[in-house]
Amino acid sequence: MIAALFAVDNIGSMGWKGSLPWPHNKDDMKWFKTITQDQIVVMGKKTWDSPDMPSPLPGRFNVLFTNKFIDRDDVEQIKGDVCEALKSLKQNNKRKNIFIIGGLNLLLQSKPVLDRIYVTRIQGEYLNDTQINLPEFLDGMRLHQTVNLGSCSVEEYHNDTVSRSIKTNTRKRKEQD
């Protein structure tokens, strides 16, 4: 599975001065850790450099999507076409889920290959310099479930088109063999 995983407030705020716009949210962070533990997390350079982000994230395979090489052995660095890179990463790691965790540009570029989108809803409206048009980003996705975490909630969306496409391509390959 290739999934986007991010949090927004009531107006789509995602970032403020390289950080999250709202105060630390224990419920969201606990859920984030649970779902990404032992999986692959993919992020852009600004997310990697965020003061809110321990880099690398412990207990996960960290992938940095950047054109600017950093001298680190604890992260895989990739560049080029986002969708092709994500498909290749999935092909080489079939037993792992891939979570794109930010920033906004990486999320937007990855949309064509997303199987799922997980949106944490943080209540309130916060100052931001990074904002997503959530209705536009979720276009073509189907709400599967909403989970209440206490101080926030998580909405899980499925992309039936991508899932069907993957299954169809698998069937075609089997028929050709």
Predicted regions and their residues:
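Enzymes that bind and transform nitrogen-containing heteroaromatic metabolites
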Residues: M1-D177
